[in-house]
């Protein structure tokens, strides 16, 4: 087995690490100051992100996530270590490279399933970061992890579809640059469960679309990311040409969209873990208690050793998954995709918890990134399918081998 990266990956990784050291990490306190400025428009992209985007384009670090003609043409295995690096500063690096969710998943969806007209109208400006987008699937009144529960209706009426329903935690939708909502709803409630849903493209300014409020995540409004909106759709009419794929294909398209998204989340989460471990090591070498450095305490050494082992385990599993996605496709890598989605966020949560503990009161303060990183990572155990759904599916697949 060859565990080395190819030449292109090594070159991009070196370039990206230099970009992080020279531009991203120094910009973190700038971002904090801009977000704290009461005069700044709350939901707009902070100016520092716009500045970083200019530099990222100059460096050729743009749309790295997207394979094929529309992006950098990287495989999943080539992109994985780059996504990990961006995870070390998840609030700055991914948007700086135009590699932040939910736009990444929406661009992948449009590139794979969109018509030529849909790609021209929506994909091209997204690739250029002239607009933003959101993915509207989660609903407040039902357990949205079961697609059959989705209550939003998408009804054909002549040459149009009419959308009625309510969605929430629609990431990015508070940003005024968010122009597109990809909405999941039911077109045929009588069909078999995974053929009931369809997806339509809804302009955010369409009549009947109402942003009710911004939601918080553990008290964070994630304004720099465009927040998380609760949105009502009341008699929203869109042309029939705004349907993505065919009627009844919504669930299959969602799964195709979420597969790459899950590996992107997991690689960035490993970057979060590396950042947390680095902060832990620096902290315990610098702080003294009971007559010596915290680093001399056996329990602290146990945290550090366990963190390193767990990071290496995660990375190997995620890289194997990326390789399988490239060689046998997302469907063939389904078990591994679910495995990394189960293992990575909870393991990174453990590493972050130890980092917080090592920092004491500072670990829960705004003076380190740890509290925000913990909140960000904890959501991944729910986003793109909760742990329990993935475990249930994976266990059933495992049991089928013995029946």
Predicted regions and their residues:
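Cytochrome P450 core scaffold surrounding the K-helix E-X-X-R motif
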Residues: 73, 211, 242-247
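A short core secondary-structure module
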Residues: 159-160, 164-212
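A short, Trp-centered hydrophobic/proline-enriched beta-strand micro-motif
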Residues: 129-138, 183
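Flexible, glycine-rich active-site loops centered on histidine and acidic residues
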Residues: 106-113, 135-136, 190
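Short Gly/Pro-enriched turn/cap motifs at secondary-structure boundaries
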Residues: 141-145, 172-176, 189-191, 217-227
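Flexible, small-/acidic-enriched active-site or ligand-binding loops
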Residues: 149, 205-237
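Alpha-helical interface subdomain recognition
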Residues: 1-91, 99-101, 113-118, 125-130, ...
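Short, surface-exposed charged micro-motifs
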Residues: 151-153
């Amino acid at each position: 087995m060859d565990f080395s990266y190819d030449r292109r990956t090594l070159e991009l990784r070196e370039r990206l690490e230099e970009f992080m050291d020279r531009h991203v990490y120094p910009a973190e306190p700038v971002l904090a100051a801009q977000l704290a400025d009461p005069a700044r428009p709350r939901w707009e992209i902070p100016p520092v992100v716009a500045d970083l985007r200019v530099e990222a384009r100059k460096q050729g670090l743009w749309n790295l996530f997207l394979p094929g003609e529309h992006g950098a043409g990287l495989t999943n295995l080539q992109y994985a270590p780059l996504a990990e690096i961006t995870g070390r500063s998840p609030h700055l690096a991914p948007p700086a490279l135009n590699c932040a969710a939910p736009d990444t998943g929406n661009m992948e969806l449009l590139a794979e399933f969109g018509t030529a007209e849909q790609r021209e109208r929506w994909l091209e400006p997204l690739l250029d970061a002239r607009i933003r987008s959101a993915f509207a699937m989660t609903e407040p009144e039902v357990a949205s992890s079961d697609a059959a529960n989705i209550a939003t209706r998408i009804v054909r009426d002549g040459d149009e579809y009419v959308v009625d329903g309510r969605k929430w935690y629609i990431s990015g939708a508070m940003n005024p640059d968010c122009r597109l909502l990809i909405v999941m709803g039911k077109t045929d409630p009588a069909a078999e469960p995974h053929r009931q849903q369809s997806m339509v493209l809804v302009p955010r300014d369409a009549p009947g679309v109402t942003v009710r409020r911004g939601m918080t995540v553990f008290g964070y409004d994630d304004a720099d990311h465009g927040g998380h909106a609760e949105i009502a759709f009341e008699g929203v009419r869109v042309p029939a040409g705004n349907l993505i794929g065919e009627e009844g294909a919504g669930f299959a398209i969602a799964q195709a969209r979420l597969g790459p998204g899950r590996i992107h989340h997991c690689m960035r989460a490993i970057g979060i873990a590396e950042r947390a471990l680095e902060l832990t090591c620096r902290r315990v070498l610098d702080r003294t208690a009971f007559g010596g450095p915290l680093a001399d305490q056996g329990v602290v050494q146990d945290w550090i050793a366990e963190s390193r082992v767990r990071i290496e385990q995660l990375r190997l599993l995620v890289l194997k998954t990326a390789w399988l996605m490239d060689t046998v496709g997302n469907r063939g890598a389904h078990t591994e995709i679910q495995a990394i989605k189960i293992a990575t966020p909870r393991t990174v949560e453990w590493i972050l918890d130890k980092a917080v503990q090592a920092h004491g009161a500072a670990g829960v303060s705004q003076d380190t990134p740890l509290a925000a990183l913990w909140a960000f990572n904890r959501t991944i155990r729910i986003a793109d399918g909760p742990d329990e759904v993935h475990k249930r599916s994976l266990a059933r697949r495992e049991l089928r081998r013995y029946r």
